[in-house]
């Protein structure tokens, strides 16, 4: 048991001898506990050096070893859900010496990635996709005539999503030969653990029991009343002893729960289950943060870890004041607004901490709904509340709102219901990479009729635009980025800002910068250097068409800036407006290129997209030069 993160690389002689699962499978079972200890120590050390997802990986060390020990990976397919727990998997699959690069530019991804390794069979970052993908692989293997085995590893939190149950239902219906490993770390499903349960699990996973079970089906199946009696007897016996009745009813052969940290039991169960045909589910109980006491005591707080920086001391040094994160700006606004309006209800799909809702949940528990990983349900739940005169606020990451797009259109916007969406992690998210990037929300929201979409430029404007959106009698969204802003002073008073109206922050000549969002401080540097005008647009929908027309009439070039894909983004909205009015003026649109942006620091990602001060200035000066050359060519 560790109480501190090791700062020196631990001795891991057995782990160092393993470069692939093939070498792991050459070990004796007696060596596996030592390997688990070394793997856990190495994981603690590397995440301390780099930062990254932490608790989930510590909890599946033994499970990961057992899976690669029993299954012939990569020929057999292991499909991981979400991916937070795959650091041990990466270490065992030829990437141990690259773990220092995880979540860094040009380094390993923090999630499974097909381009990175043949052992990463399915790219992931969002939850509840593993069972569907694994079923597809199993069907594909069968169609190809191979004997390949497929296993999906899914957590109890991810199992709450509807997609997981859709896949379970279909896999059972098609009798797909696959294994689902339910990694239960007590975040959702209550475990049924004990000596009798472990004993029954071993029996239910044994070849004898399953051959007897299948043989009985064949024999008694010819005598319908007898088979029905036997089936009901087994159902009642197992339902009394275990939580697996639901999965058995769906058509899965359920085994468990078993201790997910007992390598002997894991290996024995997996070996037996690998030989059993049809859909199977193994329920394992694990502890998130296993082996690191602070993480065991606080699994939520240690879900992810920042890089451990060396301590520095300076005489007379004064710590710089900490900037407020946008998620905390939202959290404080939510509490303040709830104190004013008892109709406010806060909803989040399993993102209470990340969305800044802990304070609200504590102060207003009767008005707080964490619906688990169920984005579709969250949005339609809010729609139903709005039908009854309540004022729901849905706090959700940009990337996860994509999963509820039909509900957004059909259940909220089509009925013009009064639902406020606080869209966190809009724009680039840094080390979490493309699976979590909020690159598309402007594009997919602004095309929805009756939707209001606001893009605050700083912390105070975020607070005021949240209040503005809340007052709007229809669907309204406020998007804001991960992390902190410029450090603006936040006014406690809440003021509804004029809808669809921007603000001129600097009057200049020739070039007008139209900024949508928190690139404003960077744009201000460029505007100052180029003598350009600068507008804080505030709203993508409705656009401040009057301000755009005024800038077009008094400048030679308009430049739009946004942290969103250029395709269909705010720049496209400006272009559409200019075209509709017959306003002929050069327009330079700056935003994200038509690509998925790989993991790196947010600063580096912005620079790579040309959205730092240097990149913006260069793009503008080059465009002006191109315009001058074109004018000269026409004149000549």
From Swiss-Prot:
One of its GO terms (molecular function) is thiamine pyrophosphate binding. GO terms for cellular component: cytosol. Pfam families: DXP_synthase_N, Transket_pyr, Transketolase_C. It catalyses: D-glyceraldehyde 3-phosphate + pyruvate + H(+) = 1-deoxy-D-xylulose 5-phosphate + CO2. Mg(2+) binds at residues 156, 185. The keyword Transferase applies. Pathway: Metabolic intermediate biosynthesis; 1-deoxy-D-xylulose 5-phosphate biosynthesis; 1-deoxy-D-xylulose 5-phosphate from D-glyceraldehyde 3-phosphate and pyruvate: step 1/1. One of its GO terms (biological process) is isopentenyl diphosphate biosynthetic process, methylerythritol 4-phosphate pathway. Its EC number is 2.2.1.7. Binds 1 Mg(2+) ion per subunit. Catalyzes the acyloin condensation reaction between C atoms 2 and 3 of pyruvate and glyceraldehyde 3-phosphate to yield 1-deoxy-D-xylulose-5-phosphate (DXP). Homodimer. Belongs to the transketolase family. DXPS subfamily. This is 1-deoxy-D-xylulose-5-phosphate synthase. The lineage of its organism: Bacteria, Pseudomonadati, Pseudomonadota, Gammaproteobacteria, Cellvibrionales. The gene is dxs.
């Amino acid at each position: 048991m560790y109480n501190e993160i090791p700062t020196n690389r631990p001795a891991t002689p057995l782990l160092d001898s393993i470069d692939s699962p093939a070498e792991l499978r050459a070990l004796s079972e007696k060596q596996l506990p030592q390997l688990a200890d070394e793997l856990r120590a190495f994981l603690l050390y590397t995440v301390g050096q780099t930062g990254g997802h932490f608790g989930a990986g510590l909890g599946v060390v033994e499970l990961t070893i057992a899976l690669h020990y029993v299954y012939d990976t990569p020929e057999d397919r292991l499909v991981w859900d979400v991916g937070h727990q795959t650091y041990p998997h990466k270490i065992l699959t030829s990437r141990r010496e690259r773990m220092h690069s995880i979540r860094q530019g040009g380094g390993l991804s923090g999630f499974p990635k097909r381009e990175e390794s043949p052992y990463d069979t399915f790219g992931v970052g969002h939850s509840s996709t593993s069972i569907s993908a694994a079923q597809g692989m199993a069907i594909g293997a069968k169609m190809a005539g191979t004997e390949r085995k497929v296993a999906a590893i899914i957590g109890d939190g991810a199992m709450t999503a509807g997609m997981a149950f859709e896949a379970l239902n279909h896999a059972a219906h098609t009798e797909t030969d696959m294994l689902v490993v339910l990694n239960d770390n007590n975040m959702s499903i209550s475990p049924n653990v004990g000596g009798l349960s472990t004993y029954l699990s071993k029996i239910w996973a044994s070849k004898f029991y399953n051959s007897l079970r299948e043989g009985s089906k064949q024999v008694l199946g010819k005598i319908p009343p007898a088979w029905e009696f036997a089936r009901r007897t087994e159902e009642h016996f197992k339902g009394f002893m275990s939580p697996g009745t639901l999965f058995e009813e769906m058509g899965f052969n359920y085994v468990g729960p078993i201790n997910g940290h007992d390598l002997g039991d894991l290996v024995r169960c997996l070996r037996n289950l690998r030989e059993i045909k049809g859909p199977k589910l193994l329920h394992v109980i694990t502890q998130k943060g296993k082996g690191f006491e602070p993480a065991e005591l606080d699994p939520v707080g240690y879900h992810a870890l920042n890089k451990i920086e060396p301590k520095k001391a300076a005489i007379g040094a004064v710590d710089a004041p900490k900037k407020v994160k946008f998620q905390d700006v939202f959290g404080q606004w939510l509490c303040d607004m709830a104190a004013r309006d008892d109709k406010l209800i806060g909803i989040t799909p399993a993102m209470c901490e990340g969305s800044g809702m802990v304070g609200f949940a504590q102060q207003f528990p009767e008005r707080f709904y964490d619906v688990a990983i169920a984005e579709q349900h969250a949005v339609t739940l809010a729609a139903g509340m709005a039908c009854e005169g309540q004022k729901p606020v849905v706090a959700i990451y940009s990337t996860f709102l994509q999963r509820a797009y039909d509900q957004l259109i059909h259940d909220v916007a089509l009925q013009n219901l009064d639902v406020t969406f606080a869209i966190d992690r809009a724009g680039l998210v840094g080390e979490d990479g493309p699976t979590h990037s909020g690159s598309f929300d402007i594009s997919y929201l602004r095309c929805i009729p009756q939707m209001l979409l606001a893009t605050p430029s700083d912390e105070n404007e975020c607070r005021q635009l949240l209040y503005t959106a809340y007052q709007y009698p229809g669907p309204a969204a406020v998007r804001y980025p991960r992390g902190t802003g410029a450090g603006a002073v936040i006014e406690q008073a809440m003021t509804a800002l004029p809808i669809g109206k921007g603000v001129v922050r600097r009057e200049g000549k020739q070039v007008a910068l139209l900024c949508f969002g928190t690139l404003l401080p960077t744009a201000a540097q460029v505007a100052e250097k180029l003598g350009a005008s600068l507008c804080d647009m505030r709203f993508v929908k409705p656009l401040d068409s009057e301000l755009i027309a005024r800038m077009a009439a008094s400048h030679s070039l308009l430049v739009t800036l946004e942290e969103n894909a250029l395709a269909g983004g705010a720049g496209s909205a400006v272009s559409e407006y200019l075209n509709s009015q017959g306003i002929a003026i050069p327009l330079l649109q700056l935003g994200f290129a038509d690509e998925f942006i790989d993991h790196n620091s947010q600063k580096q990602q912005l620079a790579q997209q040309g959205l730092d001060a240097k990149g913006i200035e260069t793009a503008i000066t080059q465009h002006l030069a191109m315009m001058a050359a074109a004018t000269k060519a026409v004149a000549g």
